[in-house]
């Protein structure tokens, strides 16, 4: 009977450790989710800024005439 009590106690300790680990991992997932949301917001802002930039008045490489020595 004492062996059964020891096994139950071991299982309870393992369960408590697993619950603690799950709580820690859950907090990490929440932090990473918040970080991802912030990065997505920053990316949307950056894309918006890039789209609003005036195009350059310089010709593209395909539009450039070759130098005279060609």
From Swiss-Prot:
Gene3D superfamilies: 1.20.5.300. Pfam families: SlyX. HAMAP family: SlyX. PANTHER family: PROTEIN SLYX. Belongs to the SlyX family. This is Protein SlyX homolog. It comes from Shewanella woodyi (strain ATCC 51908 / MS32). The gene is slyX.
């Amino acid at each position: 009977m004492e062996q059964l009590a020891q096994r139950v106690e071991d299982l309870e300790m393992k369960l408590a450790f697993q619950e603690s680990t799950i709580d820690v991992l859950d907090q990490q997932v929440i932090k990473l989710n918040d970080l991802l949301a912030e990065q997505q917001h920053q990316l949307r802002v950056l894309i918006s800024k890039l789209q609003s930039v005036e195009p350059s008045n310089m010709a593209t490489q395909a539009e450039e005439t070759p130098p005279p020595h060609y």
